[in-house]
Amino acid sequence: MDFLKFIFYGIIQGLTEFIPVSSTAHLKIISQLFGVKDPGSSLSAIIQIGSVLAIFWYFRKYIFNTINSNSKILRPSFFSNKIYKSIFIGTIPIVLIGGIVKLFVTDFSNSFFRSNFSIAVVSILMSLIMFLADISTNKFINLSNHKYRNSLFIGISQAFAIIPGVSRSGATISMALLSGWDRKDAAKFSFLLGIPSISLAAFVEFITSINEFSTFPFLPLFVGLITTFFSSLLAIDFLLKYVSSNGLKIFIYYRLVFGILIILNL
């Protein structure tokens, strides 16, 4: 039973981490729908490691080529690379806000923000934000010509994804589009920005909830991570291809309906 449960968590986490619909919200709501225990923020953060590994694997050529073109990873030329500077700048807001949340919200897993009502309202609000982002014009910014302030704004939007229902990819892609980014590069930067933010979330949860992790069965958890990895690869490939030519419309409609259905079932 543990294996099936963790495979279930892995599939939901992997698909919804990168498709802009909120992985945390779907883990909670779909778990309730199928009568499976809500994994909570700690387990959710740990199985997200599979998603981080998927980003590395999918963009391995881009990452390694960038590293090779800027000498070795510990040399100054590496840190002068624009994309790595942008990722660093974009990660600062979630580190600050995430740290504040950890300090002052002692039981975030059971807070109002993880309630079904909050998830529903946030999902509906995000559908409106994504709609505005999708219809915005002048998409001329890309990974090569973007400004560091663009990275900061996208990073600030990512910090709000701490709230279940926001969606890290939904928030970052929307902010990028509103800032004038090209659709494909908006999604690509969102995924690359997820490497440090998701990794840090998993690390912090591990350190602060180490006693809780000792209760998780190792083999089912490992299977869950593998499942997350492969489902994340599918989601990344799908979203990059879909968004570049179709935009966010299907996800906007889905999020609106998702939020309304939750409210109707409260």
Swiss-Prot record:
Family in the record: Belongs to the UppP family.
Taxonomy, superkingdom: Bacteria
Molecular function terms from GO: undecaprenyl-diphosphatase activity
Catalytic activity: di-trans,octa-cis-undecaprenyl diphosphate + H2O = di-trans,octa-cis-undecaprenyl phosphate + phosphate + H(+)
Protein's UniProt keywords contain Nucleotide-binding: no
Keywords carried by this UniProt record: Antibiotic resistance, Cell inner membrane, Cell membrane, Cell shape, Cell wall biogenesis/degradation, Hydrolase, Membrane, Peptidoglycan synthesis, Transmembrane, Transmembrane helix
UniProt subcellular location: Cell inner membrane
Membrane topology: Multi-pass membrane protein
Transmembrane segments: 1-21, 39-59, 86-106, 117-137, 153-173, 190-210, 216-236, 246-266
One GO term describing the cellular component: plasma membrane
Protein's name according to its UniProt entry: Undecaprenyl-diphosphatase
Function: Catalyzes the dephosphorylation of undecaprenyl diphosphate (UPP). Confers resistance to bacitracin.
EC number: 3.6.1.27
Organism in which the protein naturally occurs: Prochlorococcus marinus (strain MIT 9515)
Note: Bacitracin is thought to be involved in the inhibition of peptidoglycan synthesis by sequestering undecaprenyl diphosphate, thereby reducing the pool of lipid carrier available.
Enzyme class, spelled out: hydrolase
InterPro entries linked to this entry: UppP
Keyword Metal-binding: no
Gene Ontology process terms (BP): cell wall organization; peptidoglycan biosynthetic process; regulation of cell shape; response to antibiotic
